[in-house]
Structures are given as structure tokens and as C-alpha cells.
């Protein structure tokens, strides 16, 4: 009995439309997969992970405040994807200094300056403790969204910080201005406001009119900028 003829094989060139279409599909999938990974999965561990595009595009980052160190800055642990990607229930956030080492960003609140605490033997400004306690109560141990604007000379990420409260999403810098525990940043070279400078100044003017916080000091008020020039720069 003669053998059954084998099915003829098709010699497909790498330039065949089917091959080109498949290659294009794989390449596209890899490209968008990588973009998705960078945007929603990859953790930003330190300021060194912040690419120029993240800064230039003011890419929002979601994360957890692990520590408030001063009246206008805090430590931020990036949790990309938030609850939907398991943070807080499947993926645990470190709690010890050892485990958090080289895993957080130091965030400097944009557009504002809080009273200086006691550092290096220098005295503390009035309302520095109140500002620190207020910020701790407001953001410490909570999730926030930051919008990075720049990295300052101390390797801090100057950013807008927003947090959800029962009354809606709040701008942390704006809330500090409202209660008079910060003033609008006076420096020119490193000032970052996003699109909020006019709004911040209006909030400051209202707090000043109502003599909130530091504005209750009246003529005895030394702004944080003036205080730093006197005590840290010898002016």
C-alpha cells in the first residue's frame, strides 16, 4: 500500500505578513507591558529612581507616610497601585528603620515654609512644635499622593502632597497655610508652587488677617526664611 502523502509544509519567510504581524503584536505588548510596569508596578525607592520624565511630567505617586521629621517634610514609601496591588493587605509596608533604609523619599512640601525647630544648638521658633504636631496628626501613618516638582540641594523631593479626608481631597500645603502653621515660601531660586502660587498667597493673607498661628505674633514674627538667614548663615 502506498504511503499516505504528507501535508505539504509552507516555507514562510521572516518577511511574510503573518510573521510581521505577529512580531508587531509581540513588540507592542512588550512595549506597553514595560510602560505599565514603570507607571504602575515599579517602586520608586529613593530620589535616585526619579527619572527626568517623572519630574518634568509631574507624575503623581501614591504612597504611605512612614515618618514626619519636621514641620514641612516627611518620609514617603511609594506603594504603586495602592490597595488594588495588594499594599496594606498582601504586601506589607516596612515599619523598622532598618527595613526602611534606602526605601523612602524625603518629601519637602512645596510652596510653604514652617517655623524652624531646634537644630544644631539653635533655638526653636515659636509655633515650630505646633506645626510639627499638626503635620504628624494630618499625614503620619496615612496614604498620600505626591506630585514631584524638583529635587533640592538636600536631596529632598519638593512636591505637592494631597490626602483624602472625609470632606474630600486636601492639599497639605494649603491646609497648613489656613491654620497659620506655615507661610508662603520666601526663597526665589528653589521656589516650587505648581499652579498654586496665587491660591497659596490668598490663603496666607486670610490666615494673617485672622491672626492664625504664627500670625498671632504680629510684629514679633520672624519668618522661617529670616530665621535661617540669621541663625544658619550668620546674617
Curated annotation (Swiss-Prot):
Chief location: mitochondrion
Transmembrane domains' residue ranges: 15-37
A single Gene Ontology CC term: mitochondrion
Its membrane topology: Single-pass membrane protein
Superkingdom classification of source: Eukaryota
Family that this chain belongs to: Belongs to the LCL3 family.
Protein name: Probable endonuclease LCL3
Organism: Candida albicans (strain SC5314 / ATCC MYA-2876) (Yeast)
Gene: LCL3
Amino acid at each position: 500500500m502506498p504511503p499516505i502523502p504528507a501535508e505539504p509544509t509552507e516555507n514562510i519567510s521572516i518577511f511574510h505578513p503573518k510573521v510581521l504581524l505577529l512580531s508587531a503584536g509581540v513588540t507592542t505588548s512588550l512595549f506597553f507591558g514595560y510602560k505599565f510596569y514603570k507607571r504602575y508596578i515599579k517602586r520608586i525607592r529613593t530620589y535616585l529612581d526619579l527619572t527626568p520624565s517623572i519630574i518634568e511630567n509631574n507624575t503623581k505617586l501614591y504612597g504611605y507616610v512612614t515618618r514626619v521629621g519636621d514641620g514641612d517634610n516627611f518620609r514617603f514609601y511609594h506603594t504603586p497601585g495602592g490597595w488594588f496591588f495588594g499594599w496594606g493587605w498582601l504586601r506589607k509596608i516596612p515599619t523598622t528603620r532598618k527595613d526602611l533604609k534606602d526605601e523612602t523619599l524625603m518629601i519637602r512640601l512645596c510652596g510653604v515654609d514652617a517655623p524652624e525647630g531646634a537644630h544644631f544648638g539653635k533655638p526653636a521658633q515659636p509655633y515650630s512644635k505646633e506645626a510639627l504636631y499638626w503635620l504628624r496628626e494630618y499625614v503620619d501613618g496615612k496614604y498620600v499622593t505626591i506630585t514631584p516638582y524638583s529635587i533640592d540641594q538636600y536631596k529632598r523631593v519638593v512636591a505637592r502632597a494631597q490626602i483624602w479626608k472625609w470632606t474630600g481631597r486636601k492639599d497639605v500645603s494649603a491646609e497648613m497655610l489656613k491654620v497659620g502653621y506655615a507661610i508662603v515660601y520666601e526663597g526665589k531660586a528653589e521656589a516650587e508652587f505648581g499652579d498654586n502660587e496665587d491660591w497659596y498667597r490668598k490663603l496666607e493673607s486670610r490666615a494673617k488677617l485672622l491672626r492664625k498661628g504664627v500670625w498671632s505674633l504680629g510684629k514679633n514674627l520672624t519668618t522661617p526664611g529670616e530665621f535661617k538667614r540669621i541663625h544658619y548663615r550668620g546674617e
